[in-house]
Each structure stands twice: as structure tokens, then as C-alpha cells.
Amino acid sequence: MKQFSAKYALILLATAGQALAASTQGISEDLYNRLVEMATISQAAYADLCNIPSTIIKGEKIYNAQTDINGWILRDDTSKEIITVFRGTGSDTNLQLDTNYTLTPFDTLPQCNDCEVHGGYYIGWISVQDQVESLVKQQASQYPDYALTVTGHSLGASMAALTAAQLSATYDNVRLYTFGEPRSGNQAFASYMNDAFQVSSPETTQYFRVTHSNDGIPNLPPAEQGYAHGGVEYWSVDPYSAQNTFVCTGDEVQCCEAQGGQGVNDAHTTYFGMTSGACTW
């Protein structure tokens, strides 16, 4: 894993201090540990869920051969939650989905008025929708007092966002954690997500959109093509810590997106010191 230099870290922190008038620096250790836990699961999804927390029980796999969408249903009896995690880009087939920027009506969620979502990720979603809904229903029926958590990194983050949106129409206890999420839909979709996941305040939000340093993927697809982000952004700046995590609730270009990153870079593949699929944590 490549390490950021101390000089670069200071530059990022200085930039943050100048640009984030509508944001706050520092989160609680409990929330930080929660974000790290979800990042661990999301990064482990690239390597068949290696080194996930010991409290988590690995359940059924989600898979479609045509789209190469991979995911799992997990359960944590300690935290009382059912976790759906999606792997990020892992093949040329996934890359074809990544680069399909055509905004597409979110037809599987008609109550999301005027919502359009990333065309490639919508293809991915409908390829596994029946599996996901069936497996979640099975687990939720067996464990009715458990929360439903959805997470993922990169492509997996957008898959998580579409999944969480769909599940929120049926269940009222859905939480979403994404890492390096591309813009997943238009402003109507972002607004729907913000309403459904109580994003009006960091105290109420159930949509935690985590970014890192100058990760270039959250800048894609371009806003100029009709895309927008939802959620409360939690921007992690190196050296990563609870204190170096910014809560960004204003304009989405204040934090990660303002750093000028483009595409897949070191900041995208590594979150909280964990590199996608490396399993060295």
C-alpha cells in the first residue's frame, strides 16, 4: 500500500480548513469504529470476505453471471443486523457497467418520482434484484428485530445505494454505508434518498457516504451529465482517524470532490488503511 507523505497530508488538512465552512471536523470514536467495520466488510468483498469481523456469520451469496455482480447476505447477532454487501469492480464485465453513464428510469421503484439512475448499475441491480429481495425477506422474517444494513465500495457502493433504496420501500430499518461511491443517479434520486434515509442532519442520517482524500471516483459520472450525490458525506483525510474525518452536509463539492481527483487512484482503492481485497488488516 502506498503511503501519503506527511507534506501531502498537511496540504490536505490545510485545504480542508480553508474550504469547509459548512462542514465540521471530527466524529465520535463509536461512529468512526462503525465506519471502519463497514469498510472492512466492503473491502473484504473483493476476496471472498477474507478477514471479516469474527461476529459476522457469512450467509448466501448473490451472483449473476451475465453482469458479474457479486454480493453476500451476512448476519451479526451481536449488533442484531442483517448485512448485504456488494463487491466493487472485479472484471471487464463490471467495467462495462461502470462506463454506461446513460441515466435510466428507476422503474423498479415507481414511488421514486422522476428518479433516474446510472444505466450500468441499474442493469446490475435488476440482474440480482430477485435474489436480493428473496434472501433479505427470508432473513428478515427469521430475525424480525434485526436492522437491515447495506454496504459496498465503488461499483459495490452504487449497487448498495440502489438496493437500499429498493428495500426502504418495504422495510423501515434500512441503513446504508458506502465507500468511494460514484454518483448513482440524478437529483430526484438523491433527494429521494435524502428523505428516505433522514439525511437532513448527521444526528438522524441513515445514509453514510464515506469518501477518502482525493478519491476520484466520487467525481464520476460528472454532475454536468445530470448526476448528483445523496447522503451525508464523511470525508476521511490522512492520517486517518476519528479526528481527521470531516462531516460534510453542504455542497457536495466542498470535500472529497473539491480535491481534483479523477478516476481510480490510490485514495480510491484504500480506505482506513485497507486496500481492496488485500486482506492484510
UniProtKB/Swiss-Prot annotation:
Q: What class of enzyme is it?
A: hydrolase
- Pfam families on file: Lipase_3
| Annotated InterPro entries | AB_hydrolase_fold, AB_hydrolase_lip/est, Fungal_lipase-type
Provide the leader sequence positions: 1-21
The active site annotation covers S154, D215, H268
Q: Which reaction does it catalyse?
A: feruloyl-polysaccharide + H2O = ferulate + polysaccharide
> Where would you say this protein principally sits, based on its record?
secreted
Q: Which UniProt keywords apply?
A: Carbohydrate metabolism, Disulfide bond, Glycoprotein, Hydrolase, Polysaccharide degradation, Secreted, Serine esterase, Signal, Xylan degradation
Its BP terms in the Gene Ontology are:
cell wall polysaccharide catabolic process; lipid metabolic process; polysaccharide catabolic process; xylan catabolic process
Name this polypeptide is given: Probable feruloyl esterase A
Gene encoding this chain?
faeA
